Swiss-Prot record:
This protein's name: Tyrosine protein kinase-interacting protein
Single GO MF descriptor: SH3 domain binding
Region of interest called Disordered, as start-end residue ranges on this chain: 1-49, 172-192
Ranges where the record places region CSKH/LBD2: 155-164
Compositional bias annotation for Basic and acidic residues: 15-26
Ranges of the Extracellular topological domain: 260-265
Organism: Saimiriine herpesvirus 2 (strain 484)
Source organism phylogeny: Viruses, Duplodnaviria, Heunggongvirae, Peploviricota, Herviviricetes
Length: 265
């Protein structure tokens, strides 16, 4: 009955005084829990981890602290329960520090294992840029390898043009310097057979022109010869005609002279 009377009297207080008292007791309880947790976890975990753990425990147990303070206000004479609750909080803080230390050690071991795997592994994502840069080669390397990508640089282009002129695909080599005098001269390839009209129709234009060059020249020569022969024939005919005319004139002259002599006699 006395407890019920005390609870009724407490409910009659204004809300502002209740909140003020609750805040004071919450601050005192949080200070005590921080002291106990720091003393218990100083042997296992360094200082920065203690602060994090204490903040987590205080954030998790705010509702429990409020309930305990209400119970303590209702029973002002009974402070043993608060000490028991603080003991529970200290044990919980020790467990959390132990778990956090074990988790940190596991994480460190995992990091070490990952580093070891990266050292022994063939695939390294951090070296992607270097691998890509190795694909780009100069003009000379790309020409020697026959593959790979070529990065454009004005210096490389200038050196390429200086080293390889436009007619570098048709090099002029003097084989006499490296030719052994005891070696026989290489034989010429066999002469290709003459192509007929049907076969020549399937050959390219430049091949046809090279093959038909001599017949054209021969035909032109034949035409010139025919023209010359015609001219000679005309000249011979003219000379023969003149000779015949001269002979006819001589015959007439002789005949007329004979007749004239016969008439006089």
């Amino acid at each position: 009955m006395a407890n019920e009377g005390e609870e009724i009297e407490l409910t009659e207080f204004p809300e502002t005084e209740k909140e003020r008292k609750d805040e004071e007791k919450l601050s005192s309880c949080s200070e005590e829990t921080t002291d106990t947790s720091s003393s218990s976890s100083s042997d296992h975990v360094p200082a920065p981890i203690e602060v994090n753990v204490i903040i987590q425990n205080s954030s998790r147990t705010e509702d429990e602290l409020q309930n305990s303070t209400k119970f303590a206000v209702a029973n002002e004479g009974k402070e043993i329960e608060l000490t028991g609750f603080q003991g529970k909080l200290s044990s919980c803080s020790e467990e959390t520090t132990a778990t956090s230390s074990s988790y940190s050690s596991k994480q460190a071991s995992v990091c070490i294992e990952e580093n070891g795997d990266n050292e022994t592994s063939t695939y390294r994502p951090q070296n992607v840029l270097t691998n890509l840069n190795s694909l780009y080669t100069t003009f000379e390397d790309a020409r020697a390898q026959g593959k790979g990508m070529v990065r454009y640089k004005s210096e490389d282009l200038q050196s390429f043009l200086e080293k390889y002129p436009p007619d570098y695909r048709k090099p002029k080599r003097d084989l006499s310097a490296t030719w052994d005098p005891g070696m026989p001269t290489p034989a010429l390839p066999p002469r290709p057979a003459n192509l007929g009209e049907r076969q020549a129709s399937t050959v390219r234009l430049h091949v046809k022109e090279s093959n038909c060059k001599q017949p054209r020249e021969r035909k032109a020569n034949e035409r010139n010869i025919v023209k010359d022969l015609k001219r000679l024939e005309n000249k011979v005919n003219a000379i023969i005609c003149l000779v015949v005319v001269i002979l006819a004139v001589l015959l007439l002259v002789t005949v007329l002279s004979i007749l004239h002599i016969g008439m006089k006699s």
